[in-house]
Amino acid sequence: MLKTLLIHDASSFSSRKNAPPPIIACSSTTEVHRAISLYIKPQDFVLELGAQLSDTSTHLCRTIGSDGRAVLVDVKRKDATSGRCSNRNTAPFIASNEDGESSNEESFLDRVQYEELEQFDHWRSLTKGKSYQAMVLDVGSMIGNDLYLSALSLAGEFIANQENPPRVIIVKSKTLSNLARRIVHSQRLLDGSTILPDILERTHNPIVVPCVGVNEYRRTIPFLVNGGDDVIEVGCHFGRTTTLLHDAVIKEEGGADGEQGQGFCAGVDIGPKIIANAKKQYPEINFEVVDAWNTLDLLKVKAEHCAVGTSMLGYDVVYADIGGLSGAYGLLESLALLDAIAKALEPRSIVIKSLCMNRLASQLVAFSHVWNKIETK
């Protein structure tokens, strides 16, 4: 029953025309094993990157059955630096050249191709023109660091190299799982299918809400901005959205219309002429010329306009509408900018107008969320 429910959840992605396969982000080996049980099918052709020929590889091979195929890939390394036990049992996966009686232990030689690569980049040669149904990726094992940008880059390249789109990608990565738990598709927020907690703390791991189009971008304001908040719009252009943010923060929370709160709002953009126009049209709002990537300057905007101590720096909510990042391309650049803003400004939430980020919010799934949903049924 659980398998039927979760496979239906994943198949909803593939039912959408031209929709990319879901990326299932797992934070632990236990979650990976559960995801394999629920998303991988008998007879599947699966690539495992970062195969350690241990429990995960065993579970994968059992799941695909004798009619399935698995390409298990790892990079060559010394036992002393790999974190592995030197006496790990590879017999079920690698044929022995030693003569003697056959072993009675379980063997997967009928379905496994094991590749130990001299260089990490060689993994691409195993994917081009192939038609894998799935990939299981252990980011930390494969590249040595658990970085979600690397995980998404590898997943994207794997998809692009396939002759036919894979059905699912399962990734073991705590950082990617963390991102998946924080990213909220704008439509789910606006239609009420995702309800945020009443109280969100400011943090370097804020909620991220990607939007498509300026109307959707502005419609999120009542859901995320409170009276008395400190808010900045990065990429304010001529300042129209900034004025809406300004109106939202100056209203006293719980007060009557027109009652003034103590919030702060500013808009920044890299274009001096744009900012000059915004200042002329909306003189009551703080506008400054600032590059979005200069996060220290974003902090200085508030410091220069408010008599606050260092502990009060940063913002409750950040809105971002950056030229070059709002379209279908620039995903890794968008994530890098969001990461820089989050670490420097520590907001509760970041709203970004970006089609590529919105698509990621549709594709990236925190396995913990899916499992919790199934557990409660």
Where are these regions (language model features)?
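S-adenosyl-L-methionine
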Residues: 2-40, 179-226
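Class I SAM-dependent methyltransferase core
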Residues: 48, 233
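Conserved glycine-rich SAM-binding loop
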Residues: 52-53, 237
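Conserved SAM/SAH-binding beta-strand->alpha-helix loop
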Residues: 76, 271
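Conserved SAM-binding loop
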Residues: 83-86, 278-279
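Conserved SAM/SAH-binding loop
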Residues: 116-123, 290-296
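C-terminal substrate-binding/active-site "lid" region of AdoMet-derived donor-dependent transferases
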Residues: 141-202, 324-377
